[in-house]
Swiss-Prot record:
Organism, scientific name: Citrobacter koseri (strain ATCC BAA-895 / CDC 4225-83 / SGSC4696)
UniProt KW Nucleus keyword: no
SMART domains: UreE_N
Record-given protein name: Urease accessory protein UreE
Gene Ontology biological-process entries: protein folding; protein-containing complex assembly; urea metabolic process
Gene name, Swiss-Prot/TrEMBL: ureE
């Protein structure tokens, strides 16, 4: 079994892909199966959030694996009204719901109770299978070297 021990920034030839849902992309240790069927182990620094497009390598750099964000069951809220979208973010944030925030769109793990709450605000909520890339604060530190402070 090969062990993926580091995220790399420099361009390198990809030798395999690894499709993972968010609940595995937040873990520093996991047994995984690469796109080509080989088993691998994640042995990464704690607090690293993997994003689609990130690249991991073995300690010797012989293997470079590109992360693909898996399609997941998500609720999608699309709205051109920034006030309504902000209202949705506020209410979901109060419930500590991990959110992916895009221009005119929100995504969160599918939850019919939350869907119904947002529909009461006249928002359109649909179900989809899409990659889920929530804001880093919901899980761990951002993987791309920048940090957004948060204090209470």
């Amino acid at each position: 079994m090969l062990y993926l021990t580091q995220r790399i920034e420099t361009p390198a030839a990809v030798t395999a892909t690894l499709t993972l849902p968010i609940d595995v992309r937040v873990k520093s240790r996991a047994k995984v199966v690469l796109g080509d069927g080989r088993e691998a182990g994640l042995l990464l620094p704690r607090g690293l959030l993997l994003r689609g497009g990130d690249r991991l390598s073995t300690e010797d750099g012989a293997e470079v694996v590109e992360i693909i964000a898996a399609n997941e069951a998500v609720s999608v809220v699309r709205c051109a009204d920034p006030f309504l979208l902000a209202k949705a973010c506020y209410h979901l944030g109060n419930r500590h719901v991990p959110l992916q925030i895009l221009p005119d769109e929100l995504r969160y793990h599918h939850d019919h109770v939350l869907d119904d709450m947002l529909r009461q605000f006249s928002l359109e909520v649909t179900f989809a299978h899409l990659p889920f890339e929530p804001e880093a604060g919901a899980y761990a530190s951002e993987s791309h070297g920048h940090h957004h402070g948060h204090a209470h």
